[in-house]
Amino acid sequence: MDSTFHELGISQTLIETLNALHINKPTKIQQISIPQFLSEKNLIVHSPTGTGKTAAFAIPIIEKLLKEDQTAKPTLVIAPTRELVEQIKTTFSNIAKNKKLRIISLIGGVPAWKQIKKIKTNPQIIVGTMGRIMDLLERKAIHFSDLEHLIIDEVDLMLDRGFKKQIFNLLEQINSFKQIAVYSASYNQEAINIAKQITNNGIFIGSPEFNKDANTNNDKLIKQFVCYLFSDQKKQALYSLIKTAQVKSIIVFCDTKKLVDDLHVFLRKNELRTFALHGDKKQFIRERNLKIFANTKQPTILVTTDLIGRGIHVEAIDMVINYSACLNLEAYINRMGRTGRNNHKGTCVTFCTSQEKKVFLKMVEKITDNRIAECKQMEIKLIPLKNKAKTKKGGISLDCVQKIYANAKPYDRNKRVPLASDLFKSRMRQPEKAMQKQKIHDNDWQSNM
């Protein structure tokens, strides 16, 4: 039987704030973890993407601050990325609205002196990246003699980014804390071992029901597709998919920063409103691009690495495209989890080469009862690139290209239909008059199958 926030020990004042944020009832992870948190137990929480993990620790922390003296010892929350830190800070700020709590974020890419000034206001809640926190400790600009709570979010990503040593260094610099809790959307064995060690074998909260909730939601709200392509066909397929889909918001995931920049330029040249996001971008650019994408009313594309694959909440994402196939199950779930949120239907499309097919299908079978559909069922029409469909001396005109593609069949991997970029290259070598003599018609597309 589901519990209410009141039954979990949350005050009416805070419940009213939650209701104003359209948080009317606790998720399963919140139902189980909040009472344990309020009892000051050390916790190890496994909570997949989209199950309300951030609010699961933000709500009880704010509840305790409202009941206790607000000059009490501070809470420190550590997260692996700047974007996730800002997202967590926003969650705290929204839930603590009009409660006069001081909440600050400490991240790289922002002048340290500005953050030192904020530290001097004696904030009750500090959210930061490990790198900036350790930097400020070395400068002696901040100290943690005592903490109320220490929260480590997405601990597996922290370890993946090489912060194991820093985690233990941080613990050595904290004289005492009432409570420590570790949260993550996924745990490998190393993450489990570290979590047990730093929480002194804290209470583990995780259940197949949480995964079931997430996966059932995905099955109902998110349509999954796979497109089997050669690597050199992906750009044209991406452009065609975006133009055919005609949706407002799309996230395109890539496996390298260089590829993000490359696709950003490619889509911009083809007159698509696109923004790029990765770790090498300056902080103000990252914040600006994410803010524009989150609040835009125009069709917009965000090309990114896994930087926002987890923890970043942008509502009503219509489509996720894995331009680089994701062969890690947890990462795939996290990417897919950017869409299908708050009962908003979404689509997840993965571009997959023949070499990746077997591994990808085996991976996806673990989270869906149905075989993943192929892109040909989406009726994607191949559309010529705008930036290449220009008349060149001895080349091909836009009109001629439009004739070739006017009635192109949906992409069919079994027949290995050449995509527009390949066909265009082959035609570029032929003068337009010669093509007219050959009487190229729509069925010329079929002859290339």
UniProtKB/Swiss-Prot annotation:
One GO BP annotation of this record: response to cold
Q: Which reaction does it catalyse?
A: ATP + H2O = ADP + phosphate + H(+)
Q: Give the superkingdom in one word.
A: Bacteria
- Per UniProt, the ranges with Basic and acidic residues bias are 429-449
Keyword entries, A-Z: ATP-binding, Helicase, Hydrolase, Nucleotide-binding, RNA-binding
Family annotation (CDD domains): DEADc, SF2_C_DEAD
Q: Where is this motif: DEID box?
A: 153-156
The broad enzyme category this protein falls into is: hydrolase
Recorded protein name is Probable ATP-dependent RNA helicase MG425
Q: Which organism is it from?
A: Mycoplasma genitalium (strain ATCC 33530 / DSM 19775 / NCTC 10195 / G37) (Mycoplasmoides genitalium)
